[in-house]
Each structure stands twice: as structure tokens, then as C-alpha cells.
Amino acid sequence: IKMTDIKEIKLVDVKNNSNIINNLNSIYKLWGYEEVSPSFINTLETIKGRGIIDENQVVGIVSNNSLCLRPEMTTSIVKLSSTRLINKKRPIRLFTNGMVFDKKQTNENSFKLHEKLQSGIELIGYD
């Protein structure tokens, strides 16, 4: 299967997105959330997790699809909190902004890559 097109964010939307992200970041910080920046690349095993992500929408970046572009942020943040932040006092308040990727099959032999901006918060644990 080959990629036939990339749906990117339009230049006219970049400034609007930047303003929205800046406003959201201010709100996140007011509520005590810390910014993290998860990797664009993950193993397919990590992304698939417990079957929440549809493997057919994941964009593999090597021939055997063992590595892929992130289709969403939550999985990467959960992995971060359970590894590098394992000893951090709970609850952990994290926020992130960035691009996520998925693919849409256009026909039997090709797909379109969709690049989307995502912003969100994760509250991990409790008091």
C-alpha cells in the first residue's frame, strides 16, 4: 500500500491554531498542569496498547510497521507517567499540544495521510 496524498493544516489556520494553543496553555497552567512533549514516533506495540487504537489507521514508518507515527497523545503520556514519572507524587497533571497522524484508505492500494493538531490534558492518579 502506498501513500497518495497528505492532508496538512492550511497556512491560514496556523495563526488561529497558535492563538488557540496559547490560550489553552494559559488555562492549563492556571490549573497546575505541566507541559510535556511526547515523541512523534512510537512502537506499534505501545500504540496498540489494549486494543483501543485501530491498527488500520496507524501510519507505519518502517517496512515491518514496528515503528509508527502517533495517532493520539494519551498513550504516549501514559507511557511517560509509568516510566520517567513513576516516582512523581500523584496526582500528576500534564498537558500537551502537537501533531497526530492517521491514515484513510482511498482504495485497495493507497491511503491518504492526515495530520491533525491535538491539545489536551491528562490527570493521572488521585489525592
Predicted segment positions?
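TRNA-recognition modules of translation machinery and tRNA-sensing kinases, especially anticodon-binding
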Residues: 1-127
